[in-house]
Regions:
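PP2C/PPM-type serine/threonine phosphatase catalytic domain
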Residues: 1-332
């Protein structure tokens, strides 16, 4: 395997790859602003206020914020009993006061390639969006250009690595999903109705979509682990979803296969469809952990890195008609 170049000096220090990533994350999560460091190739000085990037390399990482006109909780941790680092990377990228970009990347290829691929993809996407923001580029165009740039950046690593990448953009009340690989996105209503569900780019994912398997059968299928589309390859393809209008109290979920391969979709929906977002994340994380450790043959059990984002848009403020008495007082 070819050795990748070391990152450029960050803030005057010459850092190894792992130290450079940790310094990036320290900057990302400090003082309400983020300094986005490109991986091999240089340092980007663009600032995105409120940016969250979760690494969770060796211990669980959880972040919550009010962003994009709603509330978000993001979580990532490595697989149980795993000696190597978590290969997932998660990001929440603000795009103005009422818009946000949610990102889950699940690196493939093993240490250090998997983590490097997912972090490179996320860093490249953040860099592209920060530039597009300053140039007032349309978000859909910025996302597609950013994904293409991320694909080229991972290919340039030349170490055989690749990563999934699932993105959901929320602009006002409009949500749209972009998918490469088997990390998934779901939008559900407060009563549990599925309003959007992406298709995993895998043999079992396509079989479920075509009706040859149901979702419970797919969780136990021998080829569940196979993935047919990755970022970092010459034949990478982007699955672009149709825009949907978010309704009050709709919940948006992005998750790596660490969640989707261990918890049935109806169980996930029951936990996330209502109630505080942080409680929803805690509940599905605990259930996924339990399944990963059980392996009783009855329930799905696939130890893996676990990452998810739960976002819920704030309900629109109700407008009071002119002359209508306010609660507790008469109209003037």
């Amino acid at each position: 395997m070819e050795t990748a170049r070391q990152p450029a000096p960050l803030q005057g220090l010459r850092l190894g790859y792992r130290a450079g990533i940790l310094e990036l994350l320290r900057l990302v999560q400090g003082a309400g602003e983020a300094r986005v460091a490109a991986l091999p190739g240089g340092v980007v000085s663009n600032l995105i206020d409120g940016l969250l990037v979760l690494d969770g390399a060796f211990k669980p990482d959880s972040q919550a914020a009010d962003v994009g006109g709603g509330s978000v909780v993001a979580f990532t941790e490595r697989a149980p009993d795993k000696d190597t680092e978590n290969e997932d990377t998660v990001a929440v990228i603000p795009w103005g006061p009422e818009s946000v970009v949610l990102v889950v990347a699940d690196g493939a290829g093993g240490l250090p390639a998997g983590k490097r691929a997912s972090m490179t993809a996320v860093s490249s996407l953040v860099e592209a969006l920060s530039i597009a923001m300053s140039e007032t580029v349309v978000l859909r165009t910025a996302i597609l250009d950013g994904i293409e740039a991320a694909n080229e950046a991972v290919k340039r690593l030349a170490n055989g690595s690749a990563t999934t990448l699932t993105v959901v953009t929320i602009e006002g009340r409009i949500a749209r999903a972009y998918q490469i690989g088997d990390s998934e996105a779901v939008v559900v209503g407060q009563r549990g109705r599925i309003r959007l569900q992406t298709t995993a780019h895998s043999p079992t994912g396509f079989a479920v979509e075509a009706g040859f398997l149901d979702e419970r059968e797919a969780l136990h299928h021998a080829e569940r682990h196979l993935v047919s589309n990755f970022l970092g390859t010459s034949d990478m393809s982007i699955d672009i979803g149709a825009p949907i209008d978010l309704r009050p109290m709709d919940t948006v979920l992005l998750a790596s296969d660490g969640l989707m391969d261990n918890v049935h979709l109806d169980e996930i929906i029951e936990h996330i469809r209502k109630g505080p977002a942080d409680a929803a994340v805690e509940a599905v994380v605990e259930l996924a952990r339990k399944r990963m450790h059980s392996n009783n043959g009855k329930e799905p059990s696939k130890p893996d890195d676990l990452s998810l984002i739960v976002f819920r848009k704030r309900p629109a403020a109700r407008r009071r008609s002119p002359g209508k008495p306010s609660r507790g007082g008469a109209a003037k």
